[in-house]
């Protein structure tokens, strides 16, 4: 993701903070909101990855505690010429994964226990290669910042609703604006997720296939994860829906309404593109020796 795109998204988030601040306390509230937004943007840049990992109760693992997963990630980073990220595991039966971090030097990848149980070593390698492609493309900064700030906007809107806001009778926007903001803020959070270009997922699919050298590994994994995500809930994702776009497959897919605001391309389309890669650009055999067999 480009620096320009990051700047535009942060500016949009700041604008929403200012609007809510004005509704809460007029011009004084807007100034306070501006200061808070500036501090929050800086805090999110340095700490949003930690916050997202904490939201999902992720625990860091190493070569001793998760040798298979750690070994796969290490081998893939060597293939891709990337620094070794921190590796995390999330205790949930839904198979899924995501990457986070402001740059490749400060990146983290997370896999669920359900993912490690459901996939073959080859499929797991395909998924982790996809996440490392996000790291390589610097998608993780934008994805993590928007997840953190979208959640913050919703919380601030709830604060405005429950604690009154600007009751100045000379301000006709007060009561009406408060109601509008209460309704629009959650929608804005979902729209931010959709603003992350779906082309980033396609690009990470291709990048992951190039890193591991086997597009069909990821194609098979996506099909398995898609089926499981519709039948197994992800409690931490349900509690933090603004982070849904971080995952390789929408963790909220078990609910029909979530499909109206889907943050991911069609899994069928992604699989079709990967199969085309397998018979086209990446059809030549690649070395397969590694922790996956």
From Swiss-Prot:
Its cofactor is Zn(2+). GO terms for biological process: proteolysis. Gene3D superfamilies: Metalloproteases ('zincins'), catalytic domain. The keyword Metal-binding applies. Binds 1 zinc ion per subunit. It is a multi-pass membrane protein. The active site is at residue 131. Keywords: Cell inner membrane, Cell membrane, Hydrolase, Membrane, Metal-binding, Metalloprotease, Protease, Transmembrane, Transmembrane helix, Zinc. InterPro entries: HtpX_protease, Pept_M48_protease_HtpX, Peptidase_M48. Zn(2+) binds at residues 130, 134, 201. Belongs to the peptidase M48B family. NCBIfam families: PRK01345.1 (NF002363), PRK03001.1 (NF002826). This is Protease HtpX homolog. The gene is htpX.
